C-alpha cells in the first residue's frame, strides 16, 4: 500500500494537469459556473460542515487498509455500512435510495463479472495447455538485458489488459513473471540506483498495478469504460467513450515509465516506514 502511494499521486497529478491544460486551451470543455449558480462563502461553510462525516468515513476506510486492520474487501464493507450511516445522519436513508443504489451496483457489477467469467475460462484453458511454460521459455530465450525483459513483460501485460480482466492476468502472468524478475539484477537507468534484493518484488508489484490500471481504461474490454457506459446517457456512443480514454492511456504510460526509471517513487515510503 505504501509503495503505491506516490505512484498514485503521480498519476492523479498527471490526470489533473491534463484536464487543466485541455480546459485552458478549450474553455468550452470545462466552462465556469454562471455567477447565479455559484455559492457564497456562507453556503460553502455550510456545505463543508455537511462533508465532515463523509471525510471521516474515507479516513476510516483508508486507515483500516493502511494499518493492516482489515483487507480492502473488508474495508469496503465497512465503507458501505458507514455510507448508510452517513445517509441516515443526513436523513436521506430511504428504501428508494437504497434500492436504486443496489440496482445500479448490480447492473454494473454483472456487466463486469460476465467479462471476468469469460476471461477466467480463457486463462484456465491457456494454462492447462502449457501456455505459461511456453511464455517463460520465450522470454528467457530472447537474450535481452534485464530492463529489456522488463519492457517485454510490460508490453505483454498491456496487450493482455486489452482483452482480459486484471484477475485473469494475475493468475496467468504473475506466476510466470515474478520468478523471472527476481532472478534478474537491475542496476538502474541513467545513473540512478535500481532496486535490489527483496525490493525488486515490491517494485515489480507496483509497476504491475500501474500497468493494470492502464488495462482498466483500455478498449475494447476496459472495465472502467463499461462502468462509464452504464452510468452515462444513451445518447453518448460507446465509440466516444473509447476515444476519450486514449489520452489517459498515454498518461498511464508516462506514469509507468517514470515508476520504472525512478524506483524511489515506489520504494521511498516503505523504506521510510520500515527501514532498509
Please tell me what each predicted stretch does.
Residues 1-276:
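Alpha-helical transmembrane segments of multi-pass membrane transport proteins
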Amino acid at each position: 500500500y505504501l509503495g503505491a502511494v506516490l505512484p498514485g499521486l503521480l498519476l492523479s497529478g498527471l490526470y489533473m494537469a491534463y484536464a487543466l491544460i485541455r480546459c485552458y486551451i478549450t474553455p468550452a470543455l470545462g466552462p465556469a459556473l454562471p455567477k447565479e449558480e455559484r455559492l457564497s462563502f456562507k453556503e460553502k461553510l455550510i456545505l463543508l460542515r455537511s462533508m465532515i462525516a463523509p471525510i471521516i468515513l474515507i479516513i476510516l476506510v483508508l486507515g483500516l487498509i493502511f494499518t493492516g486492520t482489515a483487507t480492502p474487501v473488508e474495508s469496503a464493507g465497512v465503507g458501505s455500512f458507514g455510507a448508510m450511516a452517513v445517509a441516515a445522519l443526513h436523513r436521506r436513508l430511504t428504501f428508494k435510495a437504497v434500492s436504486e443504489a443496489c440496482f445500479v451496483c448490480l447492473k454494473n457489477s454483472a456487466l463486469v463479472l460476465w467479462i471476468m467469467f469469460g476471461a477466467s475460462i480463457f486463462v484456465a484453458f491457456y494454462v492447462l495447455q502449457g501456455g505459461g511454460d511456453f511464455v517463460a521459455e520465450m522470454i528467457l530465450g530472447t537474450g535481452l538485458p534485464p530492463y529489456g525483459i522488463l519492457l517485454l513483460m510490460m508490453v505483454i501485460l498491456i496487450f493482455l489488459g486489452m482483452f482480459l480482466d486484471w484477475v485473469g492476468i494475475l493468475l496467468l502472468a504473475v506466476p510466470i513473471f515474478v520468478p523471472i524478475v527476481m532472478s534478474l539484477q537491475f542496476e538502474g537507468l541513467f545513473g540512478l540506483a535500481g532496486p535490489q534484493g527483496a525490493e525488486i518484488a515490491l517494485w515489480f508489484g507496483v509497476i504491475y498495478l500501474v500497468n493494470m490500471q492502464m488495462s482498466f481504461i483500455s478498449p475494447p474490454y476496459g472495465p472502467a469504460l463499461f462502468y462509464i457506459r452504464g452510468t452515462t446517457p444513451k445518447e453518448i456512443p460507446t465509440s466516444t467513450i473509447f476515444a476519450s480514454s486514449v489520452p489517459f492511456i498515454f498518461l498511464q504510460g508516462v506514469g509507468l515509465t517514470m515508476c520504472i526509471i525512478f524506483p524511489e517513487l515506489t520504494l521511498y515510503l516503505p523504506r521510510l516506514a520500515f527501514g532498509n
